[in-house]
A protein has these predicted regions:
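Non-DNA-binding regulatory cores of transcription-related proteins
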Residues: 101-107, 112-138
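Residue-level signal for well-ordered alpha-helical positions
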Residues: 66-67, 121-122, 145
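Short, well-ordered coil/turn elements that cap or connect secondary structure elements
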Residues: 73-75, 103, 149
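Glycine-rich phosphate-binding loop signature in dinucleotide/nucleotide-binding domains
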Residues: 45-47, 99-104
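Active-site-proximal alpha-helix that buttresses catalytic centers in soluble enzyme cores
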Residues: 2-84, 88-91, 95, 127-130, ...
């Protein structure tokens, strides 16, 4: 299976007055534009996901919607995954996502520092290794036989 880790696109700046609940910050126009480009790159590279799991936070949910639209997936393939809005724990994420076929590609849309931590867990079994810069709208692909810590191989890393 291929797991695509996607950091949400650029969102509105933190502003307690405009967004008292940080989870409600929406994407800004530049973030939407960059995410469309990154999503089209996946299509060009033949890495279109079969399903997209997303943190429920507005900026991640909107990023997932762009990913679906640009890759031609129906909206039913965007699935809420609350575990993507918290520190990474592979068994918990695996339990929420369920069965993934060996030829399937899934995308997980979330936040920093949790996306780089999840990448570290899947690649090395340690959320602190390798230390990486995971910018907004970046997409990191990891090949796995099963969704288990320390068993992944880096397939791609696209940075806008």
């Amino acid at each position: 299976m291929l797991v695509l880790l996607v950091r949400h696109a650029q969102a509105a700046e933190q502003d307690a007055e405009a967004f008292p609940d940080d989870t409600e910050r929406p994407l800004v126009p530049k973030g939407r534009r960059v995410q469309r480009q990154m999503s089209r790159l996946l299509v060009k590279k033949g890495l279109t996901p079969d399903r997209v799991y997303s943190s429920p936070w507005t900026r991640a949910w909107q990023t997932a919607r762009i990913l679906l639209r640009e890759t031609g997936l129906p909206k039913e393939q965007r699935i809420r995954a609350d575990t993507l809005a918290m520190p990474p724990d592979v068994p918990t994420i695996a339990a929420e996502i369920g069965e993934i076929g060996p030829e399937e590609t899934i995308a997980l849309v979330g936040h920093e520092p949790w996306m780089s931590g999840l990448a570290g867990l899947l690649l090395t079994g340690d959320s602190a290794l390798p230390r990486m810069d995971f910018p907004k709208s970046a997409i990191l692909g990891i090949e796995l036989e099963r969704l288990e810590a320390g068993t992944g191989t880096l397939r791609c890393f696209f940075v806008p």
